[in-house]
Amino acid sequence: MAAAGSGGAGGPGPGPRGRWGGCLWVRGVLLVLGGLPAGAGAAPVSLGTSPPCRHHVLSDTEVINKVHLKTNHVTKRDADGHLRIKTIYDQSIEELLPEKRYLVKNKLFPQAISYLEKTFQVRRPAGRILLSRQCATNQYLRKENDPHRYCTGECAVHTKCGPVIVPEEHLQQCRVCREGKWPCGAVGVLDPEGVRDADFVLYVGALATERCSHENIISYAAYCQQEAKMDRPIAGYANLCPNMISTQPQEFIGMLSTVKHEIIHALGFSAGLFAFYHDQDGNPLTSRSADGLPPFNYSLGLYQWSDKVVRKVERLWNVRDNKIVRHTVYLLVTPRVVEEARKHFNCPVLEGMELENQGGMGTELNHWEKRLLENEAMTGSHTQNRVLSRITLALMEDTGWYKANYSMAEKLDWGRGLGCEFVRKSCKFWIDQHRQRRQVPSPYCDTLRSNPLQLTCRQDQRAVAVCNLQRFPNPLPPEYQYFDELTGIPAEDLPYYGGSVEIADYCPFSQEFSWHLSGEYQRSSDCRILENQPELFKNYGAEQYGPHSVCLLQKSAFIMEQCERKLSYPDWGSGCYQVSCSPQGLKVWVQDTSYLCSRAGQVLPVRIQMNGWIHNGNLLCPSCWDFCEQCPPETDPPAANLTRALPLDLCSCSSSLVVTLWLLLGNLFPLLAGFLLCVWH
């Protein structure tokens, strides 16, 4: 995968896949939406914008399968321990700047690997891992009843896993056939000890490769060797592009998510491995040729999987002008994935989980469909708040190589319980149905981005967001033209409008964003990150970012008052505020003042004093159940909660009189003191 900070739009080129203006200048601040590349002539865009993930499967000459592991006893499904990943850092990691090296070795990879080791168990090989050597000519022979492969000619000087050179102490003895003839045998040093107490060896590098310079990516990863008994990957690599490693605290969560995503590709979620999956009894789900391998698809450059793993299906797809077209999708149809997908969407007839069908080679088929699982960790771009859901854990179980600990799955709100119409039809059908009922078409949206911005909340209510519906420079493909009408848009222009993230089938949705100043990243709109707290003089809505903060809708724009001065921020609609749960219900905190939400949709009049200003505004209560495990029945708010005691206005007549009296006394005090001193003497 080629992952990046937050992105998901198409790459360069004509038509909808080309670059477009995705930036808004807001009083000197560049607002960049994740997944919106900047148009020509726009201000520079930081790594917050990137192309989709492109997981490049290594070619069949770069991947070595059927690697013999000594005493590799395999049991059926009953794994006996957590997955053990051994991390080997390349010299290029040691050459990073100290703060980047510390981030990679002490935070990013240890935390990612700790999570994955707790999440998965494996059919553990009892022996050590010794990897096969690559051949100088990429040609080799195998002998019947001999588990090793023999290079025709010579072994390669170096064996690589992706761009990283594998240490000699991890490699089997070189075995060759001179001039391609028998007898063949081992040459050179004997087998070293290899890697003990590991199920998977991960080689981590920070090499400035060609991919790093051309694809604007943070990192990429893949597997490079598979063991002989069950075809499970036993070695892989992850390469971090050195110039893209960020040490900013606000970007750590995104980078950690990227590293997890990369390692999961190397462990099993890869189109290059679909043909090697096994059932729960250890039998291959795809038939094997005489050489013990699945058939190879030369047009795809992959081993061809069977329809027990991936199946092609046609959907009836609503588009504009009341037309229905046929939309081809590929579904992953292994048993646990089907079970978890049906439960998640509440669709008992769902045939499987849809794989990505856009983004080009490396994105297609290697990820979940972005339209259906927007912020799931294994979708093809990082737009916001990645979570590793039960569906991905189910896929890893269905490889036949792992058992998943589902208590480690993270909650995925996107698409949850929305039914078959959501998961099997186009987003146009969903949006139109909700428009007819005068309902918000969540998780999609149909509000055009404008200046000033109309802010809303991300679907999980953890970040401020905007609808990413926009105009493209060219008409979208007819299959992705969804709108029969948009306020203020002429009918002839409607084919140009869609969501900014191509791999979400151009479906528009509310998306978090980040602020940039002179091209430099300032902060994101994620409510939970303390470093996103706005400066006091820019905090119009009296917002509070931090671990206990959520996004709340604003009924009206907040106004800052100081004597005769009044200021308001043109971009409004939502903000970040702390909430807490109580026996009385959900409490919203604005600075140190709490407001009780008695029911969803209740208007909270806010008037607080902060930094010498009075902040006036109205917030809308969410449902208590959105954030609390126990909630009282909803009631109308008491009168006392509707009209709260207002803070003292320091510029009112009464307060001005008090101030004037104190000033008068202050001026009179020296005169009075002087008079008393004179009398005393």
UniProtKB/Swiss-Prot annotation:
Localization, UniProt: Cytoplasm; Lipid droplet
UniProt superkingdom: Eukaryota
Cofactor(s) required for function per UniProt: Zn(2+)
Gene3D superfamilies membership: 3.10.170.20, Leishmanolysin , domain 2, Leishmanolysin domain 3
Binding site for Zn(2+): 261, 265, 367
Active site: 262
Keyword Zinc-finger appears in the UniProt entry: no
A molecular-function term among this protein's GO annotations: metalloendopeptidase activity
Top EC class for this record: hydrolase
One Pfam family recorded for the sequence: Peptidase_M8
Annotated EC: 3.4.24.-
Keyword Hydrolase recorded: yes
Cysteine-cysteine disulfides: none
Biological processes per GO annotation: cell adhesion; cell division; proteolysis
Entry similarity comment: Belongs to the peptidase M8 family.
Protein name: Leishmanolysin-like peptidase
Annotated gene: Lmln
